[in-house]
Structure formats: structure tokens, C-alpha cells
Design a protein with these regions (language model features):
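Bacterial N-terminal signal peptides that target proteins for export
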Residues: 15-27
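Bacterial N-terminal signal peptides
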Residues: 25-35
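Sec/Tat signal peptide C-region and signal peptidase I cleavage site
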Residues: 37-41
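Mid/C-terminal beta-alpha module of Rossmann-like enzyme folds, strongest
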Residues: 42-51, 57, 221-272
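NAD(P)H-binding glycine-rich loop region in Rossmannoid oxidoreductase-like domains
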Residues: 45-46, 50-53, 71-142
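Aromatic pocket-lining residues of Rossmann-like dinucleotide-binding sites
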Residues: 62
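Conserved cofactor-binding/catalytic machinery of classical short-chain dehydrogenase/reductase
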Residues: 96, 132, 177, 219-222
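Glycine-/Pro-rich loop/turn segments that contact NAD(P) or position catalytic residues
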Residues: 116-210, 215
Length: 272
């Protein structure tokens, strides 16, 4: 029962079923009987990069949590083959700002799981991990979203990281994308996972670190769990952290974990 309402209260003169005969009052009464909590089902989340390995896990986690999910995809028909029918589809591309603006209509949150590919230079790190993320952040700020969660990567501050030599300075461009998110003005959470694995999620705890000095691995499913947990936690806002698996048992108190993190300092100017 919700606080202030008891079973006796519903049978007394204060609140009776006769007094809530029709319409919205019935809905309110049912909500009270259910415990007074509001479902997140009406909250729409736009997911960029929804068909990728991390994005698919994010969509699955959002659906399990009762959110409405809208996937920003280049090919809706192809995406439907991957994600199924329990998702809305908005045709667009993070490299094209106008398509993001349209896709964000009605959304309360957004999660980015985008990443560059080696196959097409036009999908390289500069254009996806920096310019695309900047487009998404600025569109999210213009749409006054409650929060933008961005999956980045551990190692973004290490210019000598081998991945930069192997893949067109991918971590440097991801770092530039992070800077654009911080400067955009939208409330945000930046998640920097370590090496990604396909192991089942929820089997162990996770380590939330700051300073970009650690190493480790993390299941994709656990990255998705943390992203979705951050959506409803004020303690996660305007924070950047690395994410690795831990030896402890599965985490349950996400608010406490986020609250132990330091908030990001005020952002500086972003290079064009």
C-alpha cells in the first residue's frame, strides 16, 4: 500500500470505491492499490547504435525495464530483423543532425551505443564517435532531454593506446565526443567500459572507477544494465566513469554506486 493509504482507508469514508466511479479516478485508485508507484512505460528512450552488439543489449534491458524504445537506424527494415517488433523505428543517422531532431520528438531520454567501423571511411571515428556524438548531444540539449547516456570506452585519455594506431585514433575521437557531450548542456552520463565480452550479465559485480587508469573486461549485458540504471538516478548525472567486472556479487544499489563518483568539472571549449 502507498504511504498514507491503508486497506482500512479504502473501506472508510475517506476513500471509497463509490467516490471514484469512472474515468481517471479509477486509474488513480488502481495506482494506489498497486502501491502508488508510476510505471516507466510512458518514458520513451531513443537508442542510437541500437543494432550493434552493445545497442542490442541496451534495447533488451530497456524493454525488460518497461520503457518504450525507439531505435535510430539507417535501415528500419533491416533493424527490425535484428531487434523485432517491440521497438519503434526512426530512420536516421547520427552524422545528420536533422534526422536526430526528428527522432527525439516525444523522447525523455537517449542512450548512445554508436561506434565507428573499419569498412567505410565515412563511418570512421571522426565522423561517428566525434561529430555524430556531438550532433546527438546538441540535439538532446535542444530537445531538453532529461538525460543522455553515452557508451564511450576506457582508454580515451591515453593517446599512446595501441587502438589509436590500429584504428584511426578511435579513442582520441571518442574523447573529443565526450568533450562535446559535456559542453552541450544536456544532463549526461558517460560510461567507459573496458574490454567487451559476450559472457552472461548479472553474474558478478562491477567496478566503477574514475581517472582512466584501470584495466579489465565487462560483459556487454552488464554495460547495458548500468546504462539503464543511470537513467533514473540523479546521482549518475554529469559523471564520467570506467566500468569493469568485479569479483563481488551482483550489484543492486546503483544509486549508492553512482553517488560515490565525483561529478565532472565544468567543461572547457570544444575544438571544432
Amino acid at each position: 500500500m502507498s504511504r498514507g493509504y491503508t486497506a482500512r482507508g479504502f473501506n472508510s469514508g475517506r476513500v471509497t470505491m463509490r467516490k471514484i466511479a469512472t474515468g481517471r479516478a479509477w486509474v488513480m485508485a488502481l495506482a494506489l492499490l498497486a502501491g502508488g508507484s508510476q510505471s516507466v512505460a510512458a518514458d520513451l528512450v531513443l537508442v542510437a547504435g541500437a543494432t550493434g552488439r552493445t545497442g542490442q543489449q541496451v534495447v533488451r534491458e530497456l524493454n525488460a525495464a518497461g520503457y518504450r524504445v525507439r531505435a535510430l537506424v539507417r535501415d528500419p527494415a533491416g533493424a527490425r530483423n535484428v531487434l523485432g517488433d517491440g521497438v519503434e523505428y526512426a530512420q536516421g543517422d547520427v552524422r545528420e543532425r536533422s534526422t536526430i531532431d526528428a527522432a527525439l520528438k516525444g523522447a525523455r531520454y537517449a542512450i548512445s551505443a554508436v561506434g565507428a567501423t573499419r569498412k567505410d571511411p565515412a563511418n570512421g571515428p571522426e565522423f561517428v564517435d566525434f561529430q555524430g556524438i556531438r550532433n546527438l548531444a546538441e540535439a538532446a540539449a535542444a530537445a531538453k532531454l532529461d538525460q543522455l547516456v553515452v557508451v564511450s570506452s576506457a582508454g580515451v585519455t591515453r593517446e599512446d593506446h595501441p587502438l589509436n594506431k590500429m584504428f584511426d585514433n578511435v579513442l582520441i575521437w571518442k574523447g573529443r565526443g565526450e568533450e562535446a557531450v559535456r559542453a552541450s548542456g544536456v544532463p549526461y552520463t558517460i560510461v567507459r567500459p573496458g574490454g567487451l565480452t559476450d559472457k552472461p550479465g548479472g553474474q558478478s559485480g562491477v567496478r566503477l572507477e574514475q581517472g582512466d587508469k584501470g584495466t579489465g573486461f565487462i560483459p556487454l549485458a552488464d554495460v547495458a544494465r548500468v546504462c539503464v540504471a543511470a537513467l533514473k538516478s540523479p546521482a549518475a548525472r554529469n559523471r564520467t566513469f570506467e566500468l569493469y567486472s568485479a569479483q563481488s556479487g551482483p550489484d543492486t544499489d546503483w544509486d549508492a554506486a553512482f553517488a560515490r563518483l565525483a561529478a565532472d568539472p565544468a567543461p572547457g571549449p570544444v575544438q571544432p
